[in-house]
Amino acid sequence: MIRYFTAGESHGPALSAIVEGMPAGISIAPEDINDELARRQRGYGRGGRMNIETDTAAVLSGIRFGKTIGSPITLQIENRDWKNWTVKMAQFEQPEENIPAITIPRPGHADLTGMIKYGFQDIRPVIERASARETAARVAACSLAKVFLRHAGIQIGSYVSAIGPAGEIAPSPKMQELLSQGAASLSRAADASCVRMLDKENEEAAIAAIDKAKEDGDTLGGIIEVFITGVPLGLGTYVQHDRRLDAALAAALLSIQAVKGVEIGSAFDNARRPGSQVHDEMYVEDGSAPVRKTNRAGGIEGSMSNGQVIHLRAAMKPIATLMSPLHSFDLSSMEAHLSHIERSDTCAVPACSVIAEAVVAPILANALLEKTGGDHLEEILERLNAYKASIAKQFQT
C-alpha cells in the first residue's frame, strides 16, 4: 500500500514528504517530479509568492540509479522565502524584537478554529500549516504514483471548466477528442492556457473576471474536471465502505485546501432525472466487450471502476484572504475588526487542478496494487496483463 506524509510550514526552511510502499523497479527522473511542481506554480491570478519560489525536489532516499528500490522515498523542497522569515519562524531562538501576535481571524479560513483547538494565542502557527503551500509537498509525493500508473497504461488529466462566472460545465467536443488520445493529452492542451481552460472565449472571460476581482480586492473560485483513462474494469470494491473507489477518490479531492464539493460523473444532474435517463446502457456485439454510448456514472459503478473513463469534478471556493477584508473580530479584545490580511492569490483554480491530478494518483495506484499484488514493477505488470486477458476472455462468445 502506498501512503505518504508531508511536513513543513509555509514559511519554514523546507517542505518534506515521505512516500512509503512504492513498488521497486520504477524508473524515475528528476523532471518527473519537478515538472509537476512547475505546473502547480503556474496560473493566472497567483500572488507574489510564486515570484520567489522555484520549486524543485531533492530526493534523499528510496531511489538508486534512477529506479525505486522499495524503501521509503524522502523528498524535500526548499522554501526560498525562508530567508525573509528566519526571525518570525525561528524554531528555537527567542526573537529579540517583539513580534505582534495575529489575533484577527479570516472568515472561511482555519484561523479561528485552529487557534482555539490547539491553544494558540497567535494565528500564525495555524496559517503556516493550513496554507496551501503544503500542496507542493503533496504534488511531489504523488508524482511518483503518477509515473507508476503510466507504466500500467493509466493516465490522469485535468482542465478548468469554470472560474467565477466564466466558463461552462458542459463537455466540449475538443475535450472528447483529447481524451481519445489519453488523459495526459487533455492536460497538455490545458497547460497551454494560463487558466487551464480549453476554450479561448472562456479563457478570455476568466482572465477578465480575475482582473476585476483583483481590482476589487476580491477572490475567485472555480470548477475543476479530472479524467483518468486506461483504468481496467474491477478496481475498488463494494465489500467494505473503506475500500470503495469512489469514496477514496472523493476524500482525496476534498483533502485539497478550499475544495468544498466533489461530483463523480454527472451526479448532481442525475439526481434530477429519472433512472431511464441516467444509467449507462450496455450494448453487446459479437466477440467484443460491452459498449456504452454514455458515461453518466463517471466510470464507477458499485464503487468499482467499470472500464470507462473515470470523470471527477471538484468545486474550489474562493480563497479566504481578501485584500478588501471581511468583517471579523479581534480575539484578544473581543471587539469588531476587519479580518487579517495575508499575502495571497486572487485565484488558484488552475493550480488546484494540477493538485487534483496529483492526489488521486495514489488512490488509483493502491486500487491497482490491491488487485494485482506484487512488490516490483515487472511482477505487477505481468499480473495486470493476465487480469486484462481474463476480462477479455469473459466477453468472448
From Swiss-Prot:
- Please give the Gene3D superfamilies that the UniProt record associates with this protein: Chorismate synthase AroC (3.60.150.10)
**Which reaction is catalysed here?**
5-O-(1-carboxyvinyl)-3-phosphoshikimate = chorismate + phosphate
| Record text on cofactor binding | Reduced FMN (FMNH(2)).
- Return the InterPro entries for the record: Chorismate_synth, Chorismate_synth_AroC_sf, Chorismate_synthase_CS
Top-level EC class: lyase
> Which GO MF terms does the UniProt record name?
chorismate synthase activity; FMN binding
- The organism's place on the tree of life at top rank: Bacteria
Which UniProt keywords are present, listed alphabetically? Amino-acid biosynthesis, Aromatic amino acid biosynthesis, FAD, Flavoprotein, FMN, Lyase, NADP
Which sites bind NADP(+)?
Answer: 40, 46
Cofactors, names only = FMNH2
One of the protein's GO biological processes: chorismate biosynthetic process
Which positions bind FMN?
A: 129-131, 257-258, 302, 317-321, 343
Q: Which GO terms describe its cellular component?
A: cytosol
Name its pathway.
Metabolic intermediate biosynthesis; chorismate biosynthesis; chorismate from D-erythrose 4-phosphate and phosphoenolpyruvate: step 7/7
EC number from the UniProt entry = 4.2.3.5
User: Its function?
Assistant: This reaction introduces a second double bond into the aromatic ring system.
PANTHER family tied to this protein = CHORISMATE SYNTHASE
Q: What family does the database annotate?
A: Belongs to the chorismate synthase family.
Subunit structure of this entry? Homotetramer.
Q: Under which name does UniProt file this protein?
A: Chorismate synthase
| Species assigned in the record | Prosthecochloris aestuarii (strain DSM 271 / SK 413)
